[in-house]
Structures are given as C-alpha cells and as structure tokens.
C-alpha cells in the first residue's frame, strides 16, 4: 500500500456532499469518488509500499485522543448527575442523600479517576515517543467502555427524566 496526494482538480476525482455525523464535527466526512483518476509519480507521499506503516504510526495518538474525549464526557456526565441528584427530591429529601446514589456516584468517580491515571501514563509515553498501538488501544477500550457505563448509570440516577431530551443541554455548532 502506498499513499498518494490526489488533488481536487484531477480529472475523474469528485467529492460528494458533507455527511452529518453524531460526533467529531470539526472534521468533514464526505464520499470521495475516483473514476479513472491518474496520479503522477511525484504525488507519492513517502516511500512506495510504506503507506500502511505510515498510517499505523498515527494510530496511538488517534486512539489517545478518542480516550481523552471519552473520559472528559464521562466526567461531564458524572458532574451533571451529581448536580441533578442534589436538586431532585424524592420522599422529601434529595436523591443525593440516598445510600445507593452515593455508592453509585462514588464508584463512577473512582473508575473515572483510574482511567485518568491510565490516560496520564499514556500521555507521558506519547510525549516520549514510547506509546505503542496495543497500549493506546487498551486505553481507548477502557475509556470508551467507561463512558458507556457512566452514561447508563447516570441515566438510571435521573430516573424517568434521564430519557427526556429536554433535560439535556446540547450545544450545536
């Protein structure tokens, strides 16, 4: 596999419309069409046959950035749920005062803290050019699974309101 730079004015190249995504909105995603495109030799990026290696070199940093977002989202979900449980009353007291709520929030907080330690270690490895794909993949797995767990547990702590969009504050670009 080799990498080539295909310029937008090359005959046979066309770009479809931008597709709407749920996340990562800062980068465009669209269909690209290559109909008998001819690319000159000077548009080869790097060495011939090393394209896959070049792509794999960036995977650890890409996986690290996904983990950063997942951990930040988990923390934001936890913080908003803590605020909600303090305000929400049931049986005349705040939901935050219930023992089960305290256990759940403490458990989630501890798991987020653990993921942050792993993230800090991986960031240190990246800065020293020592972060490998396997370790970065483990971090991504841990962080994204944790984000899902935190979202599910926090949804439960919101009760029926956890299923209502009116409670969520979504900012559109």
Task: Go through the PLM ranges and name each one.
Residues 1-17:
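A short core secondary-structure module
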Residues 1, 28-29:
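Short coil/turn connectors at secondary-structure junctions
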Residues 4, 54-55:
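Hydrophobic side chains in well-ordered alpha-helices of soluble proteins
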Residues 43-48:
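Cytochrome P450 core scaffold surrounding the K-helix E-X-X-R motif
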Residues 7-11, 41-42, 75:
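Basic, amphipathic alpha-helical recognition segments used for DNA target recognition
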Residues 17-19, 38:
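Short, well-ordered turn and helix-capping elements at secondary-structure junctions
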Residues 21-28:
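Short Gly/Pro-enriched turn/cap motifs at secondary-structure boundaries
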Residues 31-33, 37, 49-50, 57-171:
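Alpha-helical interface subdomain recognition
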């Amino acid at each position: 596999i080799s990498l080539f730079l295909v310029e937008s004015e090359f005959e046979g190249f066309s770009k479809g419309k931008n597709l709407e995504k749920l996340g990562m909105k800062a980068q465009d995603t669209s269909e690209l069409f290559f109909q008998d495109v001819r690319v000159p030799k000077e548009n080869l990026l790097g060495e011939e046959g090393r394209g896959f290696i070049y792509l794999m070199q960036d995977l650890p940093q890409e996986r690290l950035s996904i983990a950063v977002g997942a951990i930040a989202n988990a923390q934001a979900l936890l913080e908003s749920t803590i605020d909600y449980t303090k305000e929400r009353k049931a049986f005349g007291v705040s939901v935050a005062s219930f023992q089960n709520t305290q256990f759940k929030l403490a458990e989630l907080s501890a798991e987020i803290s653990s993921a942050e330690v792993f993230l800090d270690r991986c960031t240190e490895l990246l800065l020293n050019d020592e972060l490998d794909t396997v370790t970065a993949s483990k971090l991504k797995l841990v962080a994204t699974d944790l984000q899902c767990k935190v979202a599910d547990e926090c949804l439960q702590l919101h009760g029926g309101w956890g299923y209502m969009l009116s409670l969520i504050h979504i900012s559109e670009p």
